[in-house]
């Protein structure tokens, strides 16, 4: 599902509350790209799982993965890389509940910090820790 950016905080907060209650994980991948937004945002949602939520913003695409830990997020990132096969310069910031934040703001901030670091790395860089 593709959502609008204003819904991002609400949906992340909802997923965190659910994960906390059932003692599960939630991961967020922030995907940065150098492709024009309209083109990327029209293609990228086709790559994500039906159960994931995608929010396209000026910062990139936030992919929220319920019941997915950090290693599961890395598997998804490999799928994204294979789909684009080097045709798009992708970089990734990953954050997971409960390890990287307990609120929507904390999780989103962690993903943004990590994407910022990934942007200074090579094409396809993935940053999972601060």
Label for each model-derived stretch:
Residues 6, 71, 102-105:
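Conserved catalytic/ATP-binding subdomain
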């Amino acid at each position: 599902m593709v959502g609008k950016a204003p819904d991002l905080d609400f949906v992340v907060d909802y997923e965190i509350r659910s994960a906390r209650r059932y003692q599960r994980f939630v991961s967020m991948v922030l995907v940065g790209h150098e492709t024009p937004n309209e083109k990327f945002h029209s293609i990228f949602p086709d790559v994500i799982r039906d159960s994931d939520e995608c929010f396209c913003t000026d910062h990139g695409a936030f992919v929220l993965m319920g019941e997915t830990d950090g290693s599961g997020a890395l598997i998804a990132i490999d799928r994204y890389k294979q789909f684009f096969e080097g045709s798009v310069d992708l970089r990734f910031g990953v954050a997971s509940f409960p390890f990287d934040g307990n609120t929507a703001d904390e999780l989103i901030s962690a993903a943004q910090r990590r994407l910022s670091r990934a942007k200074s790395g090579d094409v396809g860089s993935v940053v999972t820790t601060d």
